[in-house]
């Protein structure tokens, strides 16, 4: 019995693969198509055929105190990004309703900065209260570092999921940021989970890390009990330290997605920022383990039209 069949049998029995097994799967001895086929089978079995759709609004942009080397919104780099304060409730509500009309299931406010001020947080709570009354969207939040007390208040305001990426694995984290620690990110995830919020936590691939380090990130995310795992592909931004990083090939991106699916068989593996790097191969992700997708525009880059994404999903025989 070959190694891939052994892994398939193990996953069929509801058991989880180990780090060593995932590294073995990643070595390239197994044909991509066979790996994708197993990831797709596992995805459809555990997650069904309905693609979970979310959208975001850049509710506060630029001027961030942190020095994450990939980020256009860091105040440490000259990227030409727009800088503006927290949006008013009317602007957010308008965007939310437009996204809901397009068929989106989830909607999140995303703010720049390590965290938001007390005044901003109170305003954000008010915005979520309005969104809960005026839409049927599931509400998510991505407000940076979060205390347990704030997490409780977000849940009371109607937020069901908190997004906070670990970005990369623990050992590679010092290569991407040194104004806060990897453990700061872990603590935020744990605070949100303790308050009863579902967790959306993933990272960025293509920042110079190895495939083994991506696998380490996946296992670190798995340990956190995450429900949604956004996979972003680095979109090198001019002015950031990572502006000249080599782009990943479509095959490497898809192989990473498939491995994440095998490592986390019961979580949503979510297409997120940078999937445009796949070009005409974007639809292949839905045959390699993707079960969810961030649609519309991203924080500082433009995405596909939502209608084009919906058409792609339907073309793949999936549901919305």
Swiss-Prot record:
<feature type="domain" description="Radical SAM core">
    <location>
        <begin position="46"/>
        <end position="275"/>
    </location>
</feature>
<dbReference type="InterPro" id="IPR002684">
    <property type="entry name" value="Biotin_synth/BioAB"/>
</dbReference>
<keyword id="KW-0001">2Fe-2S</keyword>
<comment type="subunit">
    <text>Homodimer.</text>
</comment>
<dbReference type="Pfam" id="PF06968">
    <property type="entry name" value="BATS"/>
</dbReference>
<dbReference type="GO" id="GO:0005506">
    <property type="term" value="F:iron ion binding"/>
</dbReference>
<comment type="pathway">
    <text>Cofactor biosynthesis; biotin biosynthesis; biotin from 7,8-diaminononanoate: step 2/2.</text>
</comment>
<feature type="binding site">
    <location>
        <position position="270"/>
    </location>
    <ligand>
        <name>[2Fe-2S] cluster</name>
    </ligand>
</feature>
<protein>
    <recommendedName>
        <fullName>Biotin synthase</fullName>
        <ecNumber>2.8.1.6</ecNumber>
    </recommendedName>
</protein>
<keyword id="KW-0408">Iron</keyword>
<dbReference type="Pfam" id="PF04055">
    <property type="entry name" value="Radical_SAM"/>
</dbReference>
<feature type="binding site">
    <location>
        <position position="200"/>
    </location>
    <ligand>
        <name>[2Fe-2S] cluster</name>
    </ligand>
</feature>
<keyword id="KW-0004">4Fe-4S</keyword>
<feature type="binding site">
    <location>
        <position position="68"/>
    </location>
    <ligand>
        <name>[4Fe-4S] cluster</name>
    </ligand>
</feature>
<dbReference type="GO" id="GO:0004076">
    <property type="term" value="F:biotin synthase activity"/>
</dbReference>
<dbReference type="InterPro" id="IPR024177">
    <property type="entry name" value="Biotin_synthase"/>
</dbReference>
<feature type="binding site">
    <location>
        <position position="108"/>
    </location>
    <ligand>
        <name>[2Fe-2S] cluster</name>
    </ligand>
</feature>
<keyword id="KW-0808">Transferase</keyword>
<dbReference type="InterPro" id="IPR007197">
    <property type="entry name" value="rSAM"/>
</dbReference>
<keyword id="KW-0411">Iron-sulfur</keyword>
<dbReference type="GO" id="GO:0051537">
    <property type="term" value="F:2 iron, 2 sulfur cluster binding"/>
</dbReference>
<dbReference type="InterPro" id="IPR006638">
    <property type="entry name" value="Elp3/MiaA/NifB-like_rSAM"/>
</dbReference>
<dbReference type="GO" id="GO:0051539">
    <property type="term" value="F:4 iron, 4 sulfur cluster binding"/>
</dbReference>
<dbReference type="GO" id="GO:0009102">
    <property type="term" value="P:biotin biosynthetic process"/>
</dbReference>
<feature type="binding site">
    <location>
        <position position="71"/>
    </location>
    <ligand>
        <name>[4Fe-4S] cluster</name>
    </ligand>
</feature>
<keyword id="KW-0093">Biotin biosynthesis</keyword>
<feature type="binding site">
    <location>
        <position position="64"/>
    </location>
    <ligand>
        <name>[4Fe-4S] cluster</name>
    </ligand>
</feature>
<dbReference type="InterPro" id="IPR013785">
    <property type="entry name" value="Aldolase_TIM"/>
</dbReference>
<keyword id="KW-0949">S-adenosyl-L-methionine</keyword>
<dbReference type="InterPro" id="IPR010722">
    <property type="entry name" value="BATS_dom"/>
</dbReference>
<feature type="binding site">
    <location>
        <position position="140"/>
    </location>
    <ligand>
        <name>[2Fe-2S] cluster</name>
    </ligand>
</feature>
<comment type="function">
    <text>Catalyzes the conversion of dethiobiotin (DTB) to biotin by the insertion of a sulfur atom into dethiobiotin via a radical-based mechanism.</text>
</comment>
<comment type="similarity">
    <text>Belongs to the radical SAM superfamily. Biotin synthase family.</text>
</comment>
<keyword id="KW-0479">Metal-binding</keyword>
């Amino acid at each position: 019995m070959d190694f891939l069949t052994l892994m398939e049998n193990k996953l069929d029995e509801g058991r989880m693969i180990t780090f060593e097994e995932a590294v073995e799967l990643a070595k390239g001895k197994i044909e991509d198509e066979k790996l994708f086929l197993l990831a797709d089978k596992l995805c459809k079995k555990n997650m069904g055929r309905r693609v979970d759709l979310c959208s975001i609004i850049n509710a506060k942009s630029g001027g961030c105190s942190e020095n994450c080397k990939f980020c256009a919104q860091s105040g440490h780099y000259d990227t030409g990004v727009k800088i503006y304060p927290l949006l008013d409730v009317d602007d957010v509500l308008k965007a939310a309703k437009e996204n809901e009309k397009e068929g989106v299931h989830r909607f999140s406010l995303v703010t720049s900065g390590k965290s938001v001020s007390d005044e901003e947080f109170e305003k954000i709570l008010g915005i979520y209260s309005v969104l809960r009354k005026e839409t049927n969207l599931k509400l998510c939040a991505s407000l940076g570092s979060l205390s347990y007390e704030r997490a409780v208040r977000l849940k009371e305001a109607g937020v069901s999921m908190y997004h906070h990426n670990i970005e990369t694995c623990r050992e590679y984290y010092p290569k991407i940021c040194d104004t806060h620690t990897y453990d700061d990110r872990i603590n935020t995830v744990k605070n949100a989970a303790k308050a009863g919020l579902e967790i959306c936590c993933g990272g960025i691939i293509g920042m110079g890390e190895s495939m083994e380090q991506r696998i380490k990130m996946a296992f670190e995310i798995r340990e956190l009990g995450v429900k949604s795992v956004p996979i972003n592909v680095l979109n090198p931004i001019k002015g950031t330290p990572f502006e000249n990083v080599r782009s990943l090939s479509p095959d490497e991106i898809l192989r990473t997605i498939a491995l994440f699916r095998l490592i986390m068989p019961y979580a949503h593996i979510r297409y997120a920022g940078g999937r445009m790097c796949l070009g005409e191969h974007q639809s292949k992700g839905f045959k390699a383990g993707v079960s969810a997708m961030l649609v519309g525009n991203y924080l500082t880059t433009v995405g596909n039209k939502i209608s084009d994404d919906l058409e792609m999903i339907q073309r793949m025989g999936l549901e919305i």
